[in-house]
Regions:
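Contiguous mid-protein beta-loop-alpha structural module that forms a pocket-lining wall or clamp
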Residues: 80-151
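A short helix-loop-beta-strand connector motif used in the catalytic cores of GNAT acetyltransferases and
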Residues: 29, 34-55, 62, 72, ...
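Core nucleotidyl-transferase/polymerase catalytic module
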Residues: 45-47, 60, 74-75, 96, ...
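Intrinsically disordered, low-complexity, positively biased terminal segments
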Residues: 2-3, 10, 14-15, 48, ...
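Long, hydrophobic/aromatic-enriched structural stretches that serve as scaffold segments
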Residues: 56-59, 64, 69-86
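Hydrophobic, proline/glycine-rich low-complexity stretches
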Residues: 2-40
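Short hydrophobic/aromatic-enriched beta-strand-loop microsegments
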Residues: 26, 124-129, 266-270
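Phosphate- and divalent-cation-binding pockets in alpha/beta enzyme and binding domains
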Residues: 56-58, 114-116, 255
Length: 296
């Protein structure tokens, strides 16, 4: 019988992991392999039976010098022939062991939430995926001071982002800003960031996340300007769903729900945000879109 083992993924292994996400219908971003790996090069695991890879999981650590490190488990997929067997449980437990000293977050699918509760995770709220065709959205007429986020000092963006994520994540943000298939915007007021968001090209359409804003008008302005950029990228495309936009909101933010409804976006999917320790003290009223189901 082939020996089961788990190894840390290398950069070249990320194509296998992203491939599993794509096969599972998760619609990963075109540059998710590079961006995810940059977040924590020790945080991606591949399960093997002998020489054969059979599944993957991420256990990404976000160090925090002022508090308990935050960790996030995602990308948890076993290939179909090995689902429902002990190997998936071993892989999940290994990920939790790597983050044993962290407050761990997950986005659990509905059918697995009871299972995750058995491992000590408690539900905080639902995250809701909404999807819409941005080709019909209005243009932003706000006149607000919106700039390309790449022009800002990374430290300034990290400081703003850290208000809405449980730990600073400079490596993630630096990678998230870089690809040409990503577009990040920040809304400025008196030299300070009061909103920012990123759109990234995916296998089908675009995902927007994060989208953090101090009020709904700022969130709407960023969202509409990101949509305008998407329309520019897709105006000559005949690919199905080229102008589809996905935004993952929290049920905690009623204004985010109102925003997607005004744009006629449709609910398509949900997860439960769960934590292994206390729920982080985040202002979800300012979180109009989470970054990703895979990394938090």
């Amino acid at each position: 019988m082939s020996a089961f083992h788990i190894r840390t993924a290398q950069a070249h292994d990320m194509d296998y992991i992203i491939g599993l996400l794509a096969e599972a219908g998760w619609n990963p971003g075109l540059h998710d392999a590079q961006c995810f790996f940059a977040s924590d090069p020790q945080g991606f695991l591949i399960a093997h039976l002998g020489e054969q890879a059979i599944g993957c999981v991420s256990a990404v650590r976000y160090p925090d010098v002022s508090a308990t490190d935050f960790g996030f488990i995602g990308c948890y997929i076993m290939q179909p022939p090995w689902r429902g067997q002990i190997y998936g449980a071993w892989l999940g437990m290994h990920a939790m062991k790597l983050l044993h000293d962290c407050n761990i977050g997950i986005d659990g699918v509905v059918e697995q939430q009871t299972h995750y509760a058995h491992f000590g995770f408690s539900m905080a709220h639902r995250n809701l995926r909404y999807m819409g065709d941005c080709s019909t959205w209005p243009t932003d007429q706000s006149g607000l001071d919106i700039v390309n986020a790449r022009t800002l000092p990374l430290a300034q963006l990290v400081a703003f982002d850290s208000q809405y994520f449980p730990a600073p994540r400079p490596a993630f943000l630096q990678a998230w800003l870089s690809p040409d298939t990503h577009h990040s915007l920040a809304l400025m007021q008196d030299g300070q960031i009061i909103a920012y968001g990123t759109a990234r090209a995916c296998i089908r359409g675009y995902k927007i996340g994060p989208l953090f804003a101090q009020d709904s008008n700022s969130a709407r302005a960023i969202l509409l300007q990101l949509a305008a950029w998407i329309r520019q990228q897709t105006q000559t495309s005949s690919a199905p769903g080229a102008s589809e936009v996905m935004l993952d909101i929290s049920e905690e933010n009623a204004q985010a729900l109102a925003l997607v409804q005004r744009l006629d976006m449709q609910f398509v999917f949900e997860t439960a945000r769960m934590y292994s320790q206390a729920r982080p003290a985040l202002n979800w009223q300012h979180i109009y879109g989470i970054s990703s189901f895979e990394l938090g």
